[in-house]
Amino acid sequence: MVRRSGVTLLVVALLVVTLMSSVSAQLNFSPGWGKRAAGASGSNGGVGEAVSGLHPSVGGAPGGVVPPGSSSPGDSCGPIPVSAVMHIYRLIRSEAVRLVQCQDEEYLG
């Protein structure tokens, strides 16, 4: 009985290794996709307005964070308002606190 389960385990392991070696995936990220989508149509559910609301100072007004330059044309975002960066930071921090609280409740409960 032990020998049979060992053989079964070996066959399953070989099957998994074979399947994993034949699978491949590629993930591509283009930082300009959002700008193209926002400018593509006028009636896009407010996406264009939301994007333009995040970048009120394209000309380089004070109070913005300027991202590093890009080597490909059309990827120049302009300055990013500090308030937008701080809002994202607060969201991430609050979610991290919530996750820690959930983990504490799980271990203590």
Swiss-Prot record:
Spell out the subcellular localization from the entry.
Secreted
Q: What is its main location?
A: secreted
Which keywords, in A-to-Z order, does the entry hold? Answer: Amidation, Cleavage on pair of basic residues, Hormone, Pigment, Pyrrolidone carboxylic acid, Secreted, Signal
- Low complexity bias locations: 49-59, 67-78
Q: Which first-to-last residue range defines the signal peptide?
A: 1-25
Disordered, as annotated region: 34-78
Tell me any Pfam family this protein matches.
Answer: Adipokin_hormo
Annotated GO molecular function terms are: hormone activity; pigment binding
- Say what the protein does: This hormone adapts the animal to light backgrounds by stimulating concentration of the pigment of its red body-chromatophores.
Family affiliation: Belongs to the AKH/HRTH/RPCH family.
Q: Which residues cross the membrane?
A: none
In the UniProt record, does the keyword Oxidoreductase occur? no
Protein name as annotated: Red pigment-concentrating prohormone
The modified positions for Tryptophan amide read 33
Q: Which residues carry this modification: Pyrrolidone carboxylic acid?
A: 26
UniProt GO cellular component terms: extracellular region
